[in-house]
Amino acid sequence: KNIKEAKVDDIVAPIVKTSEEAAKTFDKPVELIFIDGAHEYEYVKKDFELWFPKVIDGGIMAFHDTILWEGPNKVVNKYIYKSRYFKNIGTVDSITFAEKTKENKLSDCIQNRYFLFIKKIYQTICIYPRKFLVKVATKCHLIEPLRKCKKKIKKLTKKEK
């Protein structure tokens, strides 16, 4: 129903199977995969390992619940932000997305680590009392970089629309 309403039924084919069952028989190249399953680390990692080889260079991997859920958070931190096979990483709400590449450049690595740093600051602000952290961020001059990061994320998401 949602796929038809979004008018993407000509390019999106829903598969009603577990991720593991679907990956075993899925033999087409994947341009976009959205992983939203169990939140335990081992399951998210398994989903990543099953689908990563099927995603084409230039394709997008996206993961849901990557901010406050430990499993998805650990997987994207290790296999996306710290990987040499992803660039143009972004976060919208609780979704982290990245473009697969054969091997990223040094500038991509630096940008990925920078966004990981900003993400960790954002997570800290969500988890701990906000007032205290705003004071610390102000004293450490982190407010402006956070605002710039938010603007960059908005620009990246607008380009994809």
What are these regions (language model features)?
Residues 1-161:
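S-adenosylmethionine/decaboxylated-SAM
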